[in-house]
């Protein structure tokens, strides 16, 4: 097969688009759903086979939503056009999730963990997330503030509270991950928390909690009486 294979050229029993219309999207595999987005395969693979290769090359759905264009194009059969299709799909999903945030009210650390655990637990580098809250503890926004090795000399309260003021936050929560999988707070974690707590008092924007995310688990510094 020297030409790109389109969905309507795949045997009827294997056509993801037709299966979706007949059975519903919930009955399709991840690979079949991605195949509908990509539309075509290549000379070596039909579109479902290509979708399987992509998803499994980047580490499943979690990896797919974190993959860069460069990482996607390292998969055999994926060039710029297909990489941008995937990135656009992932960005739409992320924006949808952000729009849902305004419906979330925070009453306990596990509420916060639900917002960030899946996003942070598998990352290979440290990332700090800021969650801005209104006077009723409803989420206003969730923003990535720092990426890379975090320590108390690099994390400046100015960057965090600038975003809090911009969103008219009444209070904030910060979250970051430990790539090691162990969420035990380090000395730097405690120092950062103390600095942010003091700055928050001066600015009238309370730091409610600092969550550290590990491998499918988390620690709340508020629950540990560190905050």
Swiss-Prot record:
Keywords: Hydrolase, Metal-binding, Metalloprotease, Protease, Zinc. One of its GO terms (biological process) is proteolysis. This is UPF0758 protein CPE2144. Pfam families: RadC (PF04002), UPF0758_N (PF20582). The keyword Acetylation does not apply. Zn(2+) binds at residues 176, 178, 189. Residues 105-227 form the MPN domain. The lineage of its organism: Bacteria, Bacillati, Bacillota, Clostridia, Eubacteriales. GO terms for molecular function: metal ion binding; metallopeptidase activity. It comes from Clostridium perfringens (strain 13 / Type A). It comes from the Bacteria. A motif (JAMM motif) lies at residues 176-189. InterPro entries: MPN, RadC_JAB, RuvA_2-like, UPF0758, UPF0758_CS, UPF0758_N. Belongs to the UPF0758 family.
């Amino acid at each position: 097969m020297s030409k790109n294979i389109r969905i309507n050229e795949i045997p009827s029993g294997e056509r993801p688009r037709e299966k979706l219309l007949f059975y519903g999207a919930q009955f399709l595999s991840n690979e079949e759903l991605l195949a509908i987005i990509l539309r075509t395969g290549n000379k070596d693979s039909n579109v479902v086979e290509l979708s399987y290769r992509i998803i499994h090359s980047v580490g499943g759905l979690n990896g797919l939503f974190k993959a860069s264009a460069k990482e996607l194009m390292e998969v055999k059969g994926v060039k710029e056009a297909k990489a941008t299709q995937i990135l656009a799909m992932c960005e739409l999903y992320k924006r949808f999730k952000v729009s849902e945030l305004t419906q979330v009210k925070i009453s306990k650390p596990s509420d916060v963990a639900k917002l960030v655990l899946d996003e942070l637990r598998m990352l290979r580098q440290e990332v700090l997330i800021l969650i801005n809250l209104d006077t009723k503890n409803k989420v206003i926004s969730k923003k990535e503030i720092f990426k890379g090795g975090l320590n108390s000399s690099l994390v400046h309260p100015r960057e965090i509270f600038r975003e809090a003021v911009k969103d008219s936050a009444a209070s904030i929560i910060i979250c970051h991950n430990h790539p090691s999988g162990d969420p035990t707070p380090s000395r730097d974690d405690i120092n950062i928390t103390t600095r942010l707590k003091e700055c928050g008092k001066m600015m009238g924007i309370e730091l409610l909690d600092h969550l550290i995310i590990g491998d499918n688990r988390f620690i709340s510094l508020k629950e540990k009486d560190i905050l």
